[in-house]
Amino acid sequence: GIDPNYRTSRQVVGEHQGHKVYGPVDPPKVLGIHGTIVXVDFDLCIADG
């Protein structure tokens, strides 16, 4: 799952459509964690609902 401390343990590396992106990011394979209040780890998410 997502590291519950990602906001302090990871660095903000950019923004995407108005929300923060926490790194590391190295597209196309490593996409980081998107969001601050509700976050999605794009490296763990398989978009199944």
From Swiss-Prot:
Its cofactor is [3Fe-4S] cluster; [4Fe-4S] cluster; Zn(2+). Keywords: 3Fe-4S, 4Fe-4S, Electron transport, Iron, Iron-sulfur, Metal-binding, Methylation, Repeat, Transport, Zinc. Residues 1-36 are annotated as: N-terminal extension. Zn(2+) binds at residues 16, 19, 34. Residues 37-49 are annotated as: Ferredoxin. This is Zinc-containing ferredoxin. Gene3D superfamilies: 3.30.70.20. One of its GO terms (molecular function) is metal ion binding. Binds 1 [3Fe-4S] cluster. It comes from the Archaea. Ferredoxins are iron-sulfur proteins that transfer electrons in a wide variety of metabolic reactions. It comes from Acidianus infernus. [3Fe-4S] cluster binds at residue 45. The modification N6-methyllysine is found at residue 29. Disulfide bonds: none annotated. The keyword Electron transport applies.
